[in-house]
């Protein structure tokens, strides 16, 4: 099993400039799911995607001229593995001096390698120079929790803070906070994010939810793992009928990671970059 501490994170790395798919370092999802009460071999109560955006992708055409593009990778949450982010960066950098016939050929190669590493089918989208001006930005929709004037003293995940008023009429609500911060599981470096919680069910106490989200501030876990922990904690403590959790993290090493988990059929998020990304 590939363990996070064996990944390139936190270690000096040689930057290869010739294509090398072996640089990708997969990490199994299951150990962290077991940690949040989801045993191996049983269905998980959510589905979704991890949306990765790469801003530093370059290669050479067959004449040796550099090419650049943005790339989006959509990794289903039911793949057995995630990819450690520094290894992803090193892998993408390995294309820098690699001659490739066309963007379509690169897209096919990326699809193959990421699908092999994650154990599933990864969608790859490239945005070449001609279409860069068409890229849109947008903020997460919803009622902003950060408006609340609260006192905070918990900085490790505290699901017991969460509660909903089960005696009230069910509501359909979308809540947003930009105060999510967690830390890399291996290096402890800060990860900054915005999070959107959509649900149908008994009204979730908003002050409690904001305190809970802030409680991740000193927690060490990868982005995908944090979102799944949030999903499970809200489900168990507040018991909504429908729940979707979406986080957009700021980029590091030319990559941003945006996990989405839901228990009901809905369109995947539109992947608009927010101002902090």
UniProtKB/Swiss-Prot annotation:
Highest taxon listed in the record's lineage: Bacteria
Q: Which residues form a coiled coil?
A: none
GO biological process assignments = queuosine biosynthetic process; tRNA modification
Q: Catalytic activity, per the record?
A: 7-aminomethyl-7-carbaguanine + 2 NADP(+) = 7-cyano-7-deazaguanine + 2 NADPH + 3 H(+)
Keywords of the record, alphabetical order, are: Cytoplasm, NADP, Oxidoreductase, Queuosine biosynthesis
Q: What does this protein do?
A: Catalyzes the NADPH-dependent reduction of 7-cyano-7-deazaguanine (preQ0) to 7-aminomethyl-7-deazaguanine (preQ1).
Q: Which NCBIfam families does this one have?
A: QueF (TIGR03138)
Its name, as the record gives it, is NADPH-dependent 7-cyano-7-deazaguanine reductase
Q: Which gene encodes it?
A: queF
